[in-house]
């Protein structure tokens, strides 16, 4: 199928929850991207204001949480405050009971980030929730909204996804971004190459593409997507050196100079400057890292609008 950006948003495309890219067809993905582009161009929301959202982040976040908050604000939603550190979670309350509580008091949409892979399966299997769940990231499983903003950024840059060569580089095994992006990029016809330490590869992800060193592929890529070294998910040990990692696996100045003139640099952030990427390359002319963040608001508006439509039709 064609992966050109869809020109018309199908208002009938709805889903009550937004959980995983595995649930989405290629058309679903491209419709969200196009709706995000319409929001970026100034299109008005197609939902009534006043819906109630709550953002339940059990892992630290700057970009995803504030991006969802801004998206909710622009859609005219009311936002309930939630801080796990000052909630009954500290008293032993389970995720399920926390979500059931906010459901009972009137939240319509819960954006949830949790360290447990597929946490949403248990929540929804009970059949007891009236609210909609939007996955803000589950462990090393999925990060579907990040995938949408990455795809929007690539589509804006090139006008298409099929035929592009995308290097996903770094800590693959701990990265929900790598998993989600690789699944959709390959489905849309991109050539995905994985680079990084061999011990940080994950066959369930790397089987979707090929493996190489960054030096072997950097001159051929259209997109160099660098991943953060996720120190909070493993112990790299006392011998880990950011300088050595950058020299061996990261995007150095020398490697960046070998990229094609039209190639772009991406990173889901937060960035460990001087580790995955030379510090000044974060804001180089070829970098789209901060454009990704801006696009995150737009696609999350599209996701929330879709979920609200889904609540009305299902």
From Swiss-Prot:
<feature type="binding site">
    <location>
        <position position="270"/>
    </location>
    <ligand>
        <name>carbamoyl phosphate</name>
    </ligand>
</feature>
<feature type="binding site">
    <location>
        <position position="146"/>
    </location>
    <ligand>
        <name>carbamoyl phosphate</name>
    </ligand>
</feature>
<dbReference type="GO" id="GO:0006207">
    <property type="term" value="P:'de novo' pyrimidine nucleobase biosynthetic process"/>
</dbReference>
<dbReference type="InterPro" id="IPR036901">
    <property type="entry name" value="Asp/Orn_carbamoylTrfase_sf"/>
</dbReference>
<comment type="subunit">
    <text>Heterododecamer (2C3:3R2) of six catalytic PyrB chains organized as two trimers (C3), and six regulatory PyrI chains organized as three dimers (R2).</text>
</comment>
<dbReference type="GO" id="GO:0005829">
    <property type="term" value="C:cytosol"/>
</dbReference>
<feature type="binding site">
    <location>
        <position position="143"/>
    </location>
    <ligand>
        <name>carbamoyl phosphate</name>
    </ligand>
</feature>
<dbReference type="GO" id="GO:0004070">
    <property type="term" value="F:aspartate carbamoyltransferase activity"/>
</dbReference>
<feature type="binding site">
    <location>
        <position position="176"/>
    </location>
    <ligand>
        <name>L-aspartate</name>
    </ligand>
</feature>
<comment type="similarity">
    <text>Belongs to the aspartate/ornithine carbamoyltransferase superfamily. ATCase family.</text>
</comment>
<dbReference type="InterPro" id="IPR006130">
    <property type="entry name" value="Asp/Orn_carbamoylTrfase"/>
</dbReference>
<feature type="binding site">
    <location>
        <position position="228"/>
    </location>
    <ligand>
        <name>L-aspartate</name>
    </ligand>
</feature>
<comment type="pathway">
    <text>Pyrimidine metabolism; UMP biosynthesis via de novo pathway; (S)-dihydroorotate from bicarbonate: step 2/3.</text>
</comment>
<feature type="binding site">
    <location>
        <position position="113"/>
    </location>
    <ligand>
        <name>carbamoyl phosphate</name>
    </ligand>
</feature>
<dbReference type="InterPro" id="IPR006132">
    <property type="entry name" value="Asp/Orn_carbamoyltranf_P-bd"/>
</dbReference>
<protein>
    <recommendedName>
        <fullName>Aspartate carbamoyltransferase catalytic subunit</fullName>
        <ecNumber>2.1.3.2</ecNumber>
    </recommendedName>
</protein>
<feature type="binding site">
    <location>
        <position position="91"/>
    </location>
    <ligand>
        <name>L-aspartate</name>
    </ligand>
</feature>
<dbReference type="Pfam" id="PF00185">
    <property type="entry name" value="OTCace"/>
</dbReference>
<dbReference type="InterPro" id="IPR002082">
    <property type="entry name" value="Asp_carbamoyltransf"/>
</dbReference>
<feature type="binding site">
    <location>
        <position position="64"/>
    </location>
    <ligand>
        <name>carbamoyl phosphate</name>
    </ligand>
</feature>
<dbReference type="GO" id="GO:0016597">
    <property type="term" value="F:amino acid binding"/>
</dbReference>
<dbReference type="GO" id="GO:0044205">
    <property type="term" value="P:'de novo' UMP biosynthetic process"/>
</dbReference>
<dbReference type="GO" id="GO:0006520">
    <property type="term" value="P:amino acid metabolic process"/>
</dbReference>
<feature type="binding site">
    <location>
        <position position="63"/>
    </location>
    <ligand>
        <name>carbamoyl phosphate</name>
    </ligand>
</feature>
<comment type="function">
    <text>Catalyzes the condensation of carbamoyl phosphate and aspartate to form carbamoyl aspartate and inorganic phosphate, the committed step in the de novo pyrimidine nucleotide biosynthesis pathway.</text>
</comment>
<keyword id="KW-0808">Transferase</keyword>
<keyword id="KW-0665">Pyrimidine biosynthesis</keyword>
<feature type="binding site">
    <location>
        <position position="269"/>
    </location>
    <ligand>
        <name>carbamoyl phosphate</name>
    </ligand>
</feature>
<dbReference type="Pfam" id="PF02729">
    <property type="entry name" value="OTCace_N"/>
</dbReference>
<dbReference type="InterPro" id="IPR006131">
    <property type="entry name" value="Asp_carbamoyltransf_Asp/Orn-bd"/>
</dbReference>
